[in-house]
Amino acid sequence: LSAYAGKYICDSDLSAEKKTAMIKELYDRTLGMIEGQTIDTDGKFDTLDGLLSMYEMKTSELLTAASVMGCIAAGADEEKISAARAYAHDVGLAFQIVDDILDVTSTVEELGKPIGSDAQQEKTTSVTLLGLDKARELAKKYTEGAEKALSAFENNEFLCRLTDLLLNRKN
């Protein structure tokens, strides 16, 4: 997937400077995502910090690449790029925490896949570390952080709605 994104960037009409910055961002975030996926294969964490660090690498890194590369392509300033990083970080963590919650609260029909798979694989999740209510609170905190980061952008209504949908999704 990253190779296709890189080819698309190289074939674009963007300046060489923007292409270089975007390829570097894609490269750095792809390495982080691969590291997160590798760490996730063990699936056991003693602390919430360790779990969230893996979630950052596994999910937030990829969202960061997309968000930052969009900003670079649009010619955004450093303030907006920083806000995009903050948004992607928080929305990625919220997404993963909601995924943990759905694994114990959803149905096969709603989720479209077997539920309880994390427990069957003996994976540590935000729910196993915090309990369901605290995991929901943490997902809400990260969702609010993501929405706050979006305040740096004009016409952010769509992304705010999307962020809320991610928190309240059923699958």
Locate predicted features.
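Mg2+-dependent prenyl diphosphate-binding active-site environment of isoprenoid biosynthetic enzymes
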Residues: 1-149, 153-167
